[in-house]
Amino acid sequence: MKVRILTLFPEMFNGPFGTSILKKAQEKELIDIQCFNIRDFALNKHKKVDDYPFGGGAGMVMTPQPIFDCHHHVTQMLNLNEPCKTIYLSPKGSTFTQEKAMELAKEEQLIFLCGHYEGIDQRIIDELVTDEISIGDYVLTGGELPAMVIVDAITRLIPGVLSTEASYEDESFHCGLLEYPHYTRPRAFNGLEVPSVLLSGNHKDIDMWRRKQSIELTFERRPDLLKGLQLKKNEAQWVAELSKKKE
């Protein structure tokens, strides 16, 4: 996968993209990430990329010309036969989910546009942007941090990035539930014991315990995720019992 990021602050990506799984994925050439400085494409003398909004109001708005030219440069470099997704990180966008991550992970190329100040000129959105995505109901300084979050989530789903497919299939949200608790050595620590079922060696019992824990955690913390989820008869009974306890 090729990922191209249009930003005013390309240096922000060096740390997160130069460590851990993202670094290894790039070394394995499973993902190719490049950042482009929008300011480099400004044609004015002072490389100015923002201006006052028409109609008045607080803050500055990013102007069309540098972004259009930067986007054109990137699409030319990618040598695209057909348009690829251009994602604008915006609090007005649809909320990013694991389902969306799985959808984007199937793409061969992605372009991310990071806004700043009060946002970008609407004509950029109308002409270039295919998706507006938000990572939550709050406002950040720019689109750089959301871009990092989304690229990280997508990269984990690319075949070969994680050691096994099970590594991400068991994670929170992949199957619609929050992930079950994890334990490691020692068996006892400060008087706190590991659940005996995890030491039993009975994989059927372990799988059932983990599933039940996932359902209980989801019920307690994200009950909205259970709506519309297809549960087995015994799992639906667990939820019913949890509901009774809560009454």
From Swiss-Prot:
Keywords, in A-Z order: Cytoplasm, Methyltransferase, S-adenosyl-L-methionine, Transferase, tRNA processing
Cellular component aspect of the GO annotation: cytosol
Molecular function as annotated in GO: tRNA (guanine(37)-N1)-methyltransferase activity
GO terms for biological process, alphabetical: tRNA N1-guanine methylation
Protein residues bound to S-adenosyl-L-methionine: G115, I135, G136, D137, Y138, V139, L140
E.C. numbers: 2.1.1.228
InterPro entries to which the protein is assigned, alphabetical: Alpha/beta_knot_MTases, tRNA_m1G_MeTrfase_C_sf, tRNA_m1G_MeTrfase_TrmD, tRNA_m1G_MTases_N, tRNA_MeTrfase_TRMD/TRM10
Catalytic activity: guanosine(37) in tRNA + S-adenosyl-L-methionine = N(1)-methylguanosine(37) in tRNA + S-adenosyl-L-homocysteine + H(+)
Keyword Transferase tagged: yes
Pfam families: tRNA_m1G_MT
Localization annotation: Cytoplasm
Main location: cytoplasm
Keyword Transferase found: yes
CDD domains: TrmD-like (cd18080)
Class of enzymatic activity (EC top level): transferase
Functional summary from the UniProt entry: Specifically methylates guanosine-37 in various tRNAs.
Family recorded in the similarity comment: Belongs to the RNA methyltransferase TrmD family.
Oligomeric and partner information: Homodimer.
Protein name: tRNA (guanine-N(1)-)-methyltransferase
Protein species of origin: Alkaliphilus metalliredigens (strain QYMF)
